[in-house]
Design a protein with these regions (language model features):
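Residue-level signal for inorganic ion chemistry
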Residues: 23, 49, 80, 95, ...
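Residue-level signal for well-ordered, solvent-exposed loop/turn and beta-edge residues enriched
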Residues: 1, 138-139
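Conserved N-terminal catalytic core of the sugar/cofactor nucleotidyltransferase
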Residues: 2, 16, 20-93, 102-104, ...
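Short, high-confidence coil segments that cap the C-terminus of an alpha-helix
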Residues: 35, 86, 113-114, 190-191
Length: 224
């Protein structure tokens, strides 16, 4: 059962969690970590998001990358690329929350040769997330999206860090999956992809059951 059976036709990011839209939880987290600018990839019922948050919120400037057709997780990044003004970009799924210091992640290893990075959490028996194997030096060795036969210790938490030029390697104007298409391709091409292991909280609201867990878990998250 998917989340829409509980929250109706609203965009997933506007699903109310602990008294506020889930996207507000994520934007407040970015603000607390001293981000000044955020780009929101919007498509389905984007007016609900744009009218709620406007052009600025929580001390951050907000820009909107509008999708007129489904572009997938990688296609959305390619569509947003012209709005990026920094050398590296932090990208997050709009339906998951991880209690790590995003500012520290954005600054970490800024001068190292990794082309991309992703946050990983222990698999802990999960069978519906992207399985990831990591080398001793922290580089990703295998990315096997939602294949439970992969004997990897970690799963993808849905937070990424890219050199901005990587976004322009994604095909433009069509639906492209980051997890199933681009990440495996980049590994096969010899790109350096770093795994950032996080042992803390990782939540998503993709199903009614997880949505209810998030209601309780995020009730105490700072809302100022």
């Amino acid at each position: 059962m998917r989340l829409r059976s509980v929250v109706g036709a609203a965009p997933k990011g506007m699903a109310v969690v602990a008294g506020r839209p889930f996207l507000e939880v994520l934007l407040r987290q970015l603000s607390r970590c001293h981000f000044e600018r955020a780009i929101l990839a919007v498509g389905y019922q984007r007016e609900a998001i744009q009218s709620y948050f406007g052009e600025a919120a929580f001390g951050m400037r907000l820009l909107y990358s509008v999708e007129t057709s489904a572009l997938g997780t990688a296609g959305a990044l390619r569509n947003a690329a012209p709005l990026v003004t920094s050398k590296t970009v932090l990208a997050m799924n709009g339906d998951s929350y991880t209690d790590l210091d995003l500012g520290k992640l954005a600054a970490e290893d800024r001068d190292l040769p990794a082309d991309a990075g992703l946050v990983l959490v222990p698999a802990d028996g999960r069978s519906d997330c992207g399985f990831v194997a990591v080398k001793p030096n922290g580089e990703v060795a295998l990315f096997d999206e939602k294949d439970s036969s992969c004997r990897a210790s970690y799963v993808n938490a849905g937070i990424y860090k890219f050199k901005v030029e990587m976004l322009y390697e994604i095909p433009a104007g069509r639906e492209v999956s980051l997890e199933k298409e681009m990440l495996p391709r980049w590994l096969n091409e010899g790109k350096h992809i770093r795994g950032f292991v996080h042992a803390g909280q990782c939540l998503d609201i993709g199903t009614p059951e997880r949505y209810q867990v998030a209601q309780t878990a995020l009730a105490g998250v700072e809302a100022r």
